[in-house]
Amino acid sequence: MTVREPLRPVLYDDARDLVRLLDQKALPAEERWLELSTADAVAAAIRDLTVRGAPAIGVAAAYALAVEARRGAGPERLRAAADLLARARPTAVNLAWAVRRMSARLGAPAADVLAEAHAIRDEDEAACRRIGALGAPLVPARARVLTHCNAGALATAGYGTALGVVRAAVESGNAISVFADETRPFLQGARLTAWELHRDGIPVTLLTDGMAGWLMARGEIGCVVVGADRIAANGDVANKIGTYALAVLAAHHRLPFYVAAPWSTVDLATPTGADIPIEERGADEVVMLAGQRIAPAGVPARYPAFDVTPAALVTAIVTERGVVRAPHAAGLATLASAR
């Protein structure tokens, strides 16, 4: 089956030195693009989830620094911009990785800085396509695949990680379909994953977040495929809040639980998931929906944006360098030493 060419949510306008971001807060109602000309504006867009997904925000940050360099920012301004971008979201390691990589080039001519940002983008899309190729054979024939949040083209430079596996499986002729859970409170599954898959002609059915266990018990789910925001050296995985619960359910029902992520998401300097900083977002994102309050005034709410899935619950981690199974720590170390 031929699948529609995926969107690329982060673009660079060379003629005008602008970062163009697909406003993911406006989806699915409107396909709206924002044009940003400063690192401050891009950092704000990362913080408020205009652009989201660990690889995508890394690409956005790289282009933000390229904009600053091309517009003549001096060393002090570039250092401040890099620091601001790196701190925009603490859990997603791709962001800090991209900023570190760009920072090493900030003393070079502006054209070289932009070339490095383009390289980060191109490498991420190539990694996603390789992840898809390695992950597709893991998906059972004609399976209904459960995914969480959005780890598709919208979350990357293009093609996707978890949805890259789905996309590659479909392109190979495997007649699979997808269950996308809505992913409260930002509704990435409902607004983004369902929109992206429907746009690309891949069968998708939307679920509420509490349905997965029952559908697993009924034999309606063949495997779970998710992305990641950070993978610790021991194989623990930080991903969108709710991922851990799905991993527990999958283990109980003896279903494969796969994590798809580029190597830039692997953080060998972080020993375990307990060492990963978890971003806490504002309570308003939980108690408000589409501008309307959905909980009584005065009732507090919590929103840890991510949780950590222990490596013991992960069947395999799929990166562009290879597929890692238990023991995950040894497998990740082997892939690291092979390059």
From Swiss-Prot:
It catalyses: 5-(methylsulfanyl)-alpha-D-ribose 1-phosphate = 5-(methylsulfanyl)-D-ribulose 1-phosphate. The keyword Isomerase applies. Substrate binds at R52, G53, A54, R89, Q188, N239, K240. Pathway: Amino-acid biosynthesis; L-methionine biosynthesis via salvage pathway; L-methionine from S-methyl-5-thio-alpha-D-ribose 1-phosphate: step 1/6. Its EC number is 5.3.1.23. GO terms for molecular function: S-methyl-5-thioribose-1-phosphate isomerase activity. This is Methylthioribose-1-phosphate isomerase.
